[in-house]
Amino acid sequence: MGLFIKKPLADLMTEANDSGSKSLKRILGPWSLIALGVGVIIGAGLFSITGAVAAGYTGPAITLSFAIAALGCCFAGLCYAEFASMIPVAGSAYTYSYATMGELVAWIIGWDLVLEYCLAATTVSISWSRYLVVFLEGFGVHLPQALTACPWDGGIVNIPAFVIVVLMSILLIRGTEGSSIFNGIIVFLKVSVVLVFVVLGWKYIRMENYTPYIPTNTGTLGEFGFSGILRGAAIVFFAFLGFDAVSTAAQETKNPKRDMPIGILMSLVVCTILYMLFAHVMTGVVHYSAFAGQNGIAPVAIAIDHMGQMDASGVIRPDYPWMNRAIVIAILLGYCSVIMVTLLGQSRVFLSMSRDGLLPPLFSHIHEKFRTPARSNFLFMLLVGTLAAFVPASVAGEMCSIGTLFAFTLVCAGVLIVRKTMPDAPRSFKTPLVPFVPIAGIITCLVMMLFLPADTWIRLVLWMLIGLDIYVCYGIKHSKLEHMQKHRSGQTTLDMIGITLSVLCVITGLWHQQTVGWGESKVLLIISFVFAFTHLAFYLYRLGKQFTSLTR
C-alpha cells in the first residue's frame, strides 16, 4: 500500500477500548468536555478584537459577524463530531486522516497539529506574561522588563511565560482529573466575568448607539456595509478556534461516542452566545466610533467607563470601575486554561503518532501512577517553555491559525471520503446535510487561510519540509502498518513532494518580500532560500539515486 496505507477501523477501535494500566485514565464526562472546549476557545480574543472590529469594519453589526463566523466553525465542528463518535482515539485530525486518507496525509496533518498546539501555547504564554505585568502594575508592583520580555523585545528572558508553562505542565503530568477540575474552576470564573459584564451593562444600553445597525459602506470593500460584516466575520473567526482540542481527549472520556459530539458542539454554542451577548452590550453602551484607534482591551475599558450616570457637567461617572481589573483577571485565568488544553492536545497527538511507529516510543510511554504521557508532557514543557522565554510572540502569532484551518479542511474532506468508503461503520452522530456541510467547511477554511499574510505561509512550508525530513528518515521506516518491509513503496512520491515544497518555499519567500517591500528586512527571504536549495539538493539526490538503481 505504501504511503497511502490506511489504518483499519478495527485496529483503531481496539486502541480506543484499551483499559490497561498503560492506557490513559477515563475520567471526563460531557460537562468536563464542554468546559475543556470553552476553556480553550475563550481567551483574550473576545476582549481585544470586539471593539477593534466594530470600530473599523462592522459597527453594531459585529453580532452578525460573530454569528457568521460561528456558522463557519460549525461546519467543521459537525465533521469533527462525526469522527469523534466514530473513531474515539486521542489523535484527533491525525487519526481521522489515517483512517480515511492514508499514512502520508495523516503524518502531514499530525505534524501540522504539533505546530499548531506548540505555537498556540507559546503565544498565549507570552501574552499571559504581559497581562500579569499590567495587573501587578495596578497594585504598584513593577517587574523589570529584562525578566518579562525576550531579547528581541528589549529584555533578557521572559520568566513569567516560562513559569506558567511549567505550572500547567505539572498539572497535566499529575493527571487529567486534577487538571480537569482546575480547568472547570477557571472556566466558571471567566464565564462569570463575561456574564457580569453583560448583566450589569445591559441597563446602560442606549438604543441610539445601534443606529444605524449596519453602517453605510465607506466606498472601500470591507469597511462597513455587508462587505464589512463579512470582513469582520473573517477576523472574529479566529476567536472560535480551539474546539478541535476537545477531540484529543477522546481516550480520557468515559463514554466518548456519546460525549465527544456534545463537548465539541456545545462548547461552540456556549461561546457563540457569550460572544454575541458581549458584543451586543459593548456596542450598545457606547457608540462604536469611540473604539477607533484603541488597542488591546482599551475598548472594553471605554465601555465600562460609560456604564454610569451622567452628572450635571455632562461627564459620565462609571458605576463599576472595578470591572476593568476583573477583566484582566478573567484574561489571566482564561489564558491558563488555553495553555493547559493546548499542551494536553499536543502530547495526545504525539502519543497517537508514536503508537503508530511514526515517532520514537518515548512519546507513547504512559506513567503507571498518573496514567498520563508524562515524558511527552515533560519534553513539551521544556520546548514550549524555552520558546515562550526567548521568542517574541509576533513570530508565533498567526501560525497556529493556519495550522488549525488546515486541519479543519482535511477533517471536512475526510467526512466526504468516509461516507463513500465506510458508509456502514457505526457512528453515534452523523454530520447533517452531507455533502453541503463538509464542502461549506472546506470553502470557509480555505478562504480564511487566504486572508493570512505571506510570512505565515513561509513558516508553514518550512515546517512541512522539516516534517517531511523526519518522515523520510524515521517515520516511513518504523511505521507499524508495514513494519516488516525494509523498503516501502512511494519513495519517488516523497522526493517529488520534497521538491515541490522546496519550490513553494522560494515562491512564498518572494511573495512575502514583494508584500512588505524590497527595502525591508530580508531575513525570512534568506531563510526560505537556504531551506529551499538545501532540500532541493537533498531530494534531487535521492531521486537520482533511485533512478540509477532502477536502470542497473
Regions found by a protein language model. Give the residues of each.
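Membrane-interface "cap" regions at the ends of multi-pass membrane proteins
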Residues: 1-49, 55-60, 74-78, 87-90, ...
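Extracellular loop-to-transmembrane helix junctions
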Residues: 3, 25, 46-152, 270, ...
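Hydrophobic, membrane-embedded alpha-helices of multi-pass small-molecule transporters
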Residues: 28-47, 160-171, 201, 219-285, ...
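Membrane-helix boundary/coupling elements in multi-pass transport proteins
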Residues: 47, 112-130, 235, 240, ...
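TM-loop-TM module centered on a large, flexible mid-protein loop between adjacent transmembrane helices
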Residues: 95-96, 102, 133-145, 216-219, ...
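Membrane-interface loop-to-helix entry segments
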Residues: 129, 156-207, 264-268, 400-410, ...
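Hydrophobic alpha-helical segments and their helix-loop junctions in multi-pass secondary transporters
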Residues: 129-138, 188-217, 279-286, 413-425, ...
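C-terminal membrane-solvent junction of multi-pass transporters and transport-like membrane proteins
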Residues: 153-156, 363-372, 408-459, 466-503, ...
